[in-house]
Every structure is written in C-alpha cells, then in structure tokens.
Curated annotation (Swiss-Prot):
Major nitrogen regulatory protein. Positively acting regulatory gene of nitrogen metabolite repression. One of its GO terms (cellular component) is nucleus. GO terms for molecular function: DNA-binding transcription factor activity, RNA polymerase II-specific; RNA polymerase II cis-regulatory region sequence-specific DNA binding; zinc ion binding. Disulfide bonds: none annotated. It comes from Aspergillus niger. Residues 48-59, 745-759, 848-861 have a biased composition (Low complexity). This is Nitrogen regulatory protein areA.
Length: 882
C-alpha cells in the first residue's frame, strides 16, 4: 500500500506518503485497539482493510479542502507550526519517562508519533487520536485492578477470624476450620464486617464461660495464618495480647525467636477492660511489669488462669544473659509465698556486667523499715494483711517484688573484688573477702495496716551502755526476741580470726559517680572489711535478753554491723544517723510514724576525726524526721543558751545534728557538720566566716560584709545601709534613720552597747561596743563626712569641747552596730562616747561592728570583734563596705 485514496473516491491525485511510517502506525494503532478487547500480549496481525482510517487521513477535512490539490500544503508549513519541521514535542506534553510509568503501550505510540509527526498529514487529528487511545488503555487497567480488589475482599469476607481474634482464642486456630456451629458460621458469613471473634469472659468466674469447641474436617481458611509458638499450650481462658511476655528460654528454639515480641495495643484491650473500668493504658515496654487485674480468689476458682497470665518480676533480666555458673537456673527459682507464679529471677546476682562493682545485695536493709515496700522485715508475718476489698493497694493484687536492677553510677554497691558472692564458696588471701548479708525474709508482705504502729529503738528495760558507738559487740542480724534455730554458728564453719567485729565500714560502699578519692590512704584492707557474718557476737553479748535493739530502725547507729565512728569519705547509705542525745532511751513517748531519713554524705564525711580532713558539708534539705525522733524521745534537750531557738522537725534548715556547734577554736574539732552560727542552716553554696572564725552561710556572710550588721532572721529593711549620695543630706538621712531604729525581732538575747562611762577601765581599753583604731588610721581633718547617722549637733566650726562632738568623733554605731537599740540609747551612747574621746586626748573612737554569735552570752571570747587579731584586720572590717 503505497498511498491513500481521497475521501469520497472522487478524482484527484494520490498524495505520496511514506509506507514504512504508515505501516508502523497501523500496527501500533490496531494493536492498541485490539488490546481494549483482549489481554493477549502477542502482536496482532495486520488487518486486511485499512479503510477505517481513511477518514482520519483524507483531504476532505476542513484543514485540507478537496479542491486544493496542487498547493494545499502552505497552511501546514513552517510559518504556522515550526516545531513540526524540527520534530521537537510541544510544550506542555508529558515526556516519555513519565508516560512509561503510566502505560508502556502508549509510550511506544508516543515515540512513534514524536518521530514521524513532521511528515504526517493532519497532525492535529492524529494527536487527538493518540491521546484518546492512551486514555482508554489507562482506564481499562484501572477497571481491572478495581475488579480484582473487589473479588479478593469478597473472598476474605467469608473466611475465618482475623489474626487479632486468633490471639484471644485458643491457639492453632489458623489451621483449623472456621465453622464451629451453625449459628456462628452464619454470623460470620452474613456479616462481612465481623472480622474478629471476641470472647468477653468475666474475671469473677472464667470457668463458667467455656469457649466454643473447634472441629476438624474442613478446608483451611484463606486468611493469613499466624504461626503459634511451639511451646504454647491450648488454654480455656483468654489472655489479652497486650500483656507483656518476659524473655523466656523456650523462645530461643522457636523459628523467629530472635525477633522480640512486640506488645500490641488493639481494640481487644479496650473492649475487654471496659467492664472492669480500667482506663486506657499506654503500650507497655517489653520488660515493664504489668499488674494483671486478677486476685487470689480468682486463682482459687480457675487454676489455669495463672498459666495464662505471663510471669513477671522486676528482677527479671534477659534470658540471654551470661551466667557464669551452671546451677543458675536451679537456685534462682525462688517462689515467694505472696506470689502465685513461679517467678524466675534469671540469675540477676550472677550477671557479670551488672555485678562488676560487687554482688548486689537484694535484702540489704538501707531503706526505712516501716515502708510498705520493704521486704526485709523480720516480723512481716506477724502483721495483719490488708484484705482484698480494701481501698488501699495490697499484695493480694499481684504486685511485683522490689526492683533489683543495678544502676551504673547512683546505686551504692558493696565494693568487693571477687565475682563469687556466696558465703563459703572461695577462700581469699585478701582481708577484703566477700561478706554477704543473708536473705532474712525474701517475700513481700503488706504492712499497710501495721506500718503506723510505734516502734521502739531499744527495749525499755535495756541498759544504754550496751549500745555505745565504740562498743565491740553488736548484733548484726535483725533483732529477733529468741535465738534463731536455723542460724549457722560462724565459729564452727569459719576461722574465728577471719572476720573482725569492730572493723570500719568506710570502704564498704563506693559511690560510682564520685571520683574524689584523693584523700584516701592505702590502708584499706584489714580495717576496711565488708559485711561481717550475721550473729558474729562476742561473749559479752546477751542473746536471751529479748530484743536488744531493732537493727532496721531508722536512726540506729548499729544498723550496719560492726559500726564504729570512724568513717572515710565514702558514701554510707542506710539508717546510720547517730542518736547523740544524752538522755535515757527508756522513754514512754514514741513516734508513731517513724520514717527516718538516712545519713547524708556530709554527716559521714564530718565524722572523720582527722582535723586535716575536715570538709565542708554538703547535705540534702529533706524533712528532718530523725530530729523529730530525737525530740519525741528527749524531753530535756539541752540548749547552749536559754534563748536558743528550739529545733523544728519539719524545717529543711534545721540541722540533723545538735542545735548549734558552739564556738570552736582553731585546733578544736567540731562535733557535727558545718552549721551557720546565725541561722543554723547546713545547706549553702558557699561557707564564710565571721571575724571570730565561726562559720556563716553565704547569705549571713554577705549580709554581714555588706551592711556591717549580723543578718537578722526576720529581715527588716532599716538595717540595710543606703548610700549617701552627697554630703548635704547625709545628716538628715542619718537622723531620720536613727529615729526609726527598733529592737531586733530575733530569739537571740538582746545585748546593748556598753558605753565607756560604765567602767573607767573600759574607756581606755577595748570594750564590747567601742574599739580604738590604730593611730593615723582615721583622718583628723575636721570636715569629715559622717558615714552613719549621728545625733543632731551644733555648728561644727565651733571649737568648744561641748560642741565639737560631731567633728572629733566619727560615730558609726547606728551603721555598724550588730544589735539595734532605741534612738535614745544610741544618742546617749554617742554622747558618752564623745565625752570619753574628749577626755582621752581628743582621739577619735569608732563604735564598731560587734558580730557576737547567739551563744555569745556564755562565751566571753566572742565579746570582741577579733580577740587576737591586729588593728589592721580590724580596720579592714570597718572599711570593707565603704
């Protein structure tokens, strides 16, 4: 076929064409049309009749009229469509790459058209045809995809329950037929939206609602089967899928055991726990303990329920942890009496990574014993348990045991060198061999109803002399009223010289994040042994005298075995607060809620008797419950001064030691932590000293330095010095300020300034309120600007002795005075001081700062500014705030 005929078959010349181009176009066009009715990928044969395309390519179109056969091509030349000659596609069309993703067949046609459109007649109509063919091809494929998706969803709607429902039903449901009974099968078939089988079983009686039995014999459903675990056993009670499943040793043998089982949060939990009124929970982590809403009464009715709820424990480490002993799986399956499951602790104590700093003492009692969370209480079985119907939490609802996870830096661990932690496993040459506190009681009990009962530190008939700090005998196990028959006698199995009773426990705890061990000496072996054996008593100890002392009582200084007063810089966690009151222990009154606080870091550091290692305390501002205990057991607390303010037990500023340390000399060791002698605080970022060398906190020290007055506890603004900007108004400001003085609202004894006229000897010597500066220290020029307020004076130019008071003496008493008095007292003191200065040769005197401390009335060494210091330091104190 070498050309095309005219549209009507009339006369006219035949337009020469390119046969190869039309032949390829014919193949592509006809193939695309045939592809709309068939899905064959084979190329179709060439059609015998090509007349169906004659209308599209004839010259009978309006673009090419039939009578213009000689020169009809001028309309389609370069002047109108220059891009057809070049062969470039028009702007706005999709490129071949984009069309290749949509339809490969349409892409072939587009490539054919883009190459041959410059030589084709009727290019616009050919372009329209091409786009319509591509649109039909795309729509046809979309219809086929939609039909396939509808057929697949129709097949899945009549299949068995979904994978989510299989988790709540007995296992192996995917391989079993889906028809249980006629009613259930009709429901599944009729309702295509029924994708799950939800069994809502009341937790009160789960055995009364058995699940439907499944029968075999039908084909496997088309749903996606969920492979059940090999070790999973069919059970009658459903367990929600969101319950955590701790790592188990059996999972290592499963097919996908290396993949952690993700805890799913599905609608099953919301529906199943809606009747129980449990709020929607967050999705728990893999190892987080989940408290299932079941109780002991339910387990009595349905023993299989305990097998359905997964085991859990806070001490449960990974099953893939390295156990360096072969019997770790045997001696770690300790089943507690209060727990319904056989909890496996997975050998946490033998983990080589966590116990790098020493074996973890699971029952070491360094927490308050009256807390309900404590498990090491020896009298836990004697207490009444909280019933199930109580509004409080109790252990009848399964609570996990205490957390035994190690911390890398903040958990105090016994600093042992070896890896073995049992009692008699390996002998060691080193004196710091392994000592371990025994597990007295290894179960959790509910102490809620009995935790508020009073406890007594000592037996009321016991003598105090058995419990001094340096006594060699101490009872290392909790105080049982009778000797324990199951106790091992350490003298029969151990070397008597192996353990030292009076050993210091300074290096027993090493704080992981504390690296300031620069002051530790090398003597850390023989006298730094760890925990001694329980019951390692000497012959002087009385075992039959009842409960001598309660080892777990917070505030007892015998809570650590072999406790002595010598401590190093290591952190000691535990109830090691010394009972330093001198009264008798057998007091009738006791504290009901004795949740005592443990000793702080500063108390341990300040018990060191070496004066070279005296350090400034760093304490925590916790409520001082140990001070409350001392006040309840002490009615005759001795104070340094009768005006010393009493101690309050709930204030964070109250020291957990004596009321005030008192004046200490240079070589004297203080008996407690550093305490501010003004406000009695122990928590300050910086410690300062007054002129007498006594410690002040940062607030009191700065106040004394800036204002020249000891900081009052009830702060008044009249003691704060304001700058005198000019000399003109200084006298008026000082006068008005002197008239506003009032007595200090403080519990400290008020002491007035002793004037020089009270004693003739004091006028020429150092007195309490008047000091003589060095000669030449004060300028003798007459027009001195008064620093502080002075009484109203006459004209200062007069040279008479009675009128030269304002110029010959610089009165600094109202500014620099520690204790404020009435304005009349200040004026009288100023007049007497000026008279004394006139009688002693006109030398100016300065009424100076007298920062005596609260116990200054009983300490005569505090009556001066600097008792043994020179006048240069005195003048420095006088002028440091100018």
């Amino acid at each position: 076929m070498s050309g095309l005929t005219l549209g009507g078959g009339g006369s006219g010349g035949v337009r020469p064409t390119q046969p190869a181009a039309f032949a390829s176009l014919q193949d592509s066009a006809d193939a695309d049309r045939r592809s709309s009715t068939t899905t064959s990928n084979n190329p179709p044969p060439l059609p015998s009749d090509f007349s169906q395309l004659s209308d599209d390519f004839s010259f009978g179109s309006p673009i090419s009229p039939p009578h213009s056969s000689n020169a009809p091509d001028s309309l389609l030349h370069d002047s109108l469509f220059p891009e057809w000659k070049v062969g470039t596609p028009r702007a706005g069309f999709d490129g071949p790459d984009e069309m290749q993703r949509k339809d490969p067949l349409a892409t072939q046609i587009w490539k054919l058209y883009s190459r041959t459109k410059a030589q084709l007649p009727n290019q616009e109509r050919m372009e329209n045809l091409t786009w319509r063919m591509m649109a039909m091809s795309l729509k046809r494929k979309e219809r086929e995809r939609a039909q396939q998706s509808r057929s697949a969803s129709a097949r899945n709607s009549v299949s068995g329950p979904s994978g989510i429902a299989q988790l709540t039903s007995p296992p192996l449901i995917a391989s079993r037929p889906t028809r249980q009974n006629p009613s259930l099968s009709t429901d599944l078939t009729s309702d295509p939206m029924n994708l799950e089988r939800i069994f809502i079983v009341p937790f009160e009686s789960p055995s009364d609602h058995p699940s439907p039995q499944l029968t075999k014999g039908e084909a496997t459903s088309a749903a996606i089967p969920i492979k059940s675990r090999k070790d999973q056993v069919a059970e009658s009670t459903p367990v929600p899928a969101s319950f955590p499943h701790p790592p188990q040793d059996q999972r290592k043998n499963s097919e996908f055991g290396y993949v952690p089982r993700r805890v799913r949060k599905t609608s099953i939990d919301d529906r199943q726990f809606f009747n129980l009124q449990v709020p929607t929970r967050k999705r728990p982590a893999e190892a987080s303990p989940q408290v299932p809403p079941v109780s002991n009464a339910m387990l009595a009715q349905d023993p299989d329920l305990s097998g359905g709820v997964p085991d859990y424990a806070l001490d449960a480490s990974s099953a893939f942890a390295l156990h360096h002993n072969n019997h770790s799986s045997s001696h770690h399956n300790h089943t507690s009496p209060g727990m319904p499951f056989g909890l496996d602790t997975y050998g946490l104590g033998e983990d080589p990574i966590l116990t790098s700093a020493g074996p973890y003492q699971t029952q070491f009692t360094f927490s308050p014993t009256e807390s309900p969370m404590t498990s090491g209480n020896p009298f836990a079985n004697l207490y009444a348990h909280t019933p199930v119907a109580s509004s409080l939490n109790s252990t009848d609802f399964f609570s996990p045991p205490q957390s035994g996870y190690q911390s890398t830096a903040s958990t105090p661990q016994p600093a042992y060198d070896g890896e073995h932690s049992m009692f008699f496993d390996m002998p060691s040459v080193d004196a710091r061999t392994q000592r371990r506190v025994p597990n007295y009681v290894s179960h959790r009990t509910s102490n809620l109803s009995a935790s508020l009962q009073p406890r007594y530190m000592f037996n009321q008939n016991q003598d105090q002399s058995h419990h001094t700090g340096n006594h060699s005998s101490s009872m290392h196990s909790p105080g049982y009223p009778i000797p324990q028959p199951q106790h091992v006698d350490p003298t029969q199995v151990l070397n008597p010289n192996d353990f030292s009773t009076g050993a210091s426990h300074a290096a027993m705890f090493s704080f992981g994040a504390d690296s300031d061990n620069e002051d530790d000496d090398g003597n850390q072996f023989s006298d730094r042994a760890g925990l001694t054996m329980p019951g390692d008593l000497d012959d002087g100890a009385d075992m039959n005298g009842g409960m001598q002392w309660d080892a777990q009582f917070p505030g007892s200084f015998h809570s650590l075995p072999g406790f002595t007063a010598q401590h190093r810089k290591h952190v000691t966690i535990g109830p090691t607060d010394m009972m330093d009151t001198p009264s008798e222990w057998a007091q009738s009154g006791s504290l009901g809620r004795t949740h005592g606080s443990a000793a702080s870091v500063s108390e341990v550091r300040n018990r060191e008797q070496d004066p070279r290692r005296q350090k400034i305390a760093r304490t925590t501002s916790t409520p001082n419950t140990a001070q409350l205990l001392r006040q309840s057991m002490n009615a005759n607390t001795s104070h340094t001064s009768p005006n010393t303010p009493p101690e309050s037990g709930l204030s964070s500023a109250v020291p957990s030691r004596p009321a005030s340390p008192g004046g200490s000399k240079n070589g004297e060791q203080s008996s407690g932590p550093t305490t501010c002698t003004n406000c009695f605080t122990q928590t300050t970022p910086l410690w300062r000293r007054n002129p007498e060398g006594q410690p002040l906190c940062n607030a009191c020290g700065l106040f004394l330095k800036l204002h020249g007055v000891v900081r009052p506890l009830s702060l008044k603004t009249d003691v704060i010095k304001k700058r005198n900007r000019s000399s003109a108004n200084s006298l008026a400001v000082g006068t008005s300020r002197a008239s506003k003085k009032s007595a200090r609202k403080n519990s400290v004894q008020q002491t007035t300034v002793t004037t020089p006229t009270s004693s003739r000897a004091q006028s020429g010597a150092t007195s309490f309120g008047v000091r003589r500066p060095r000669a030449g220290a004060v300028r003798r020029a007459e027009p001195l600007v008064p620093i502080a307020a002075a009484p109203p004076k006459a004209n200062p130019t007069t040279s008479s002795p009675g009128q030269s008071r304002g110029t010959s003496s610089v009165q600094m008493a109202p500014k620099r005075q520690r204790r404020l008095e009435k304005a009349t007292d200040a004026e009288a003191g100023g007049d007497e001081a000026s008279k004394s200065s006139t009688a002693s040769g006109g030398r100016s005197k300065v009424v100076a700062l007298a920062p005596a401390m609260p116990p200054a009335a009983a300490n005569p060494a505090n009556h001066s500014i600097a008792g043994g210091q020179g006048a240069s330091q005195e003048w420095e104190w006088l002028t440091m705030s100018l």
